[in-house]
Amino acid sequence: MERQVLRLRQAFRSGRSRPLRFRLQQLEALRRMVQEREKEILAAIAADLSKSELNAYSHEVITILGEIDFMLGNLPELASARPAKKNLLTMMDEAYVQPEPLGVVLIIGAWNYPFVLTMQPLVGAIAAGNAAIVKPSELSENTAKILAELLPQYLDQDLYAIVNGGIPETTELLKQRFDHILYTGNTAVGKIVMEAAAKHLTPVTLELGGKSPCYIDRDCDLDVACRRIAWGKYMNCGQTCIAPDYILCEASLQNQIVQKIKETVKDFYGENIKASPDYERIINLRHFKRLQSLLKGQKIAFGGEMDEATRYLAPTILTDVDPNSKVMQEEIFGPILPIVSVKNVDEAINFINDREKPLALYVFSRNNKLIKRVIDETSSGGVTGNDVIMHFTVNSLPFGGVGASGMGAYHGKYSFDTFSHQRPCLLKGLKGESVNKLRYPPNSESKVSWAKFFLLKQFNKGRLGMLLFVCLVAVAAVIVKDQL
């Protein structure tokens, strides 16, 4: 591992990854890989999660193609220097912010969307000019295998590497020094990643999870709400970090919600859900048994059927759920949807705020003021009103958590920013010492007074303002020179 990181660092220090042209070439190569080897990629995803190729494409591949296209179209602007506002003391100088690559970064992907959650951060790392090591999840072994086969064929092997393996390999990787680590996964492992990174003072982006609440107001179109909630909850068999984890609603709505979600599930997957090509399976037996244990002692209003041999767990709804029960103490990450009764929106807000900050928050209501009130009085990684999941698809929005649900963000320009250092640059001339004397010892009341004038008056170059302030500073310089 150490030699591999050193090899990438030497390649990065050569400057090869910095030119804009090189970055664009690598992004185009990555797009070509996705397009040319689409069938193999889809087959690998399907094998890992019992996912149809159509779902694999719409859930994962299309997102990567969109992210690459965004970077190809916007990278020249993202990578360019941005002029910075100046004060009077620096008005004749050049001040700007120059994005620069961090160096060698580590990307640790997740198994639930093994392609998009590994490749989307890589797109950002390449766009920002970094070298990168990619570590796919070992649980999605087929996707990890195809990535290990394809990436070296399309990307510069000296700058981009892939490491496969389990806990020992990840542990060894985390011992190495990186310039940034982006990890997607659960909170417990996120703490391990952060602890390892702290030994090298390596910054981290942690995309974790949590129990994402979904509040349904009584003033709501229940048909629309239940259709959208069922889609977001049961896609990928509930194994989505921003799936609605549980529903909060008034007790009078509970039976209606159960009935409407039951009808929606039938529309989505047919009478025989198990035979539907659109309904996936739990990733492995360990997660299956964990989900099985969450159902013990619960009132199952719908679903609950399971087949351990095929890791099938039907779309399930729980009613009259005790907030202190096990199913409400951990992220479910499966097709189990508890409904918790609250008296009103005030109680819902308190319920949410009494728990860890979630990765996502959903509110359904015809009343936009109520939706905005919930947003204002709670905290979460992201929010979608009157829908679920969809904020993930908007690459002009940052995607990330807060508190226990993570730190940092990516997607679109935010991916570029995450893997970049925003370097402040000030280029001064060698003239103007009469004004610069203000900062040289010995100090005096007069110097402090002039410093207040020069430093507290902000200046941004304008057409007329430029001429006026040049004259002002010239006069001030003469006065300062006479007084010092």
From Swiss-Prot:
InterPro entries: Ald_DH/histidinol_DH, Ald_DH_C, Ald_DH_CS_CYS, Ald_DH_CS_GLU, Ald_DH_N, Aldehyde_DH_dom, Aldehyde_DH_NAD(P)
Keyword hit for NAD: yes
Entry's Gene Ontology BP terms: aldehyde metabolic process; central nervous system development; epidermis development; fatty acid metabolic process; hexadecanal metabolic process; peripheral nervous system development; phytol metabolic process
Cytoplasmic topology ranges: 1-463
Membrane spanning stretches: 464-484
Broad EC category: oxidoreductase
GO MF entries: aldehyde dehydrogenase (NAD+) activity; long-chain fatty aldehyde dehydrogenase (NAD+) activity; long-chain-alcohol oxidase activity; medium-chain fatty aldehyde dehydrogenase (NAD+) activity; protein homodimerization activity
Extent of motif Prevents secretion from ER: 481-484
Pfam families per record: Aldedh
EC numbers, comma separated: 1.2.1.3, 1.2.1.94
GO cellular component, one term: mitochondrial inner membrane
Topology relative to the membrane: Single-pass membrane protein
Main location, first listed in the record: membrane
Location within or outside the cell: Membrane; Microsome membrane; Endoplasmic reticulum membrane
Residue list for modification Phosphoserine: S293
Sequence positions that bind NAD(+): G185, N186, T187, A188, V189, G190
Keyword Endoplasmic reticulum: yes
UniProt catalytic activity: an aldehyde + NAD(+) + H2O = a carboxylate + NADH + 2 H(+); a fatty aldehyde + NAD(+) + H2O = a fatty acid + NADH + 2 H(+); hexadecanoate + NADH + 2 H(+) = hexadecanal + NAD(+) + H2O; octanal + NAD(+) + H2O = octanoate + NADH + 2 H(+)
Residue positions of the active site: E207, C241
Top-rank taxon: Eukaryota
Self-association state and partner proteins as the record states: Homodimer.
Family: Belongs to the aldehyde dehydrogenase family.
Name of the protein in its database record: Aldehyde dehydrogenase family 3 member A2
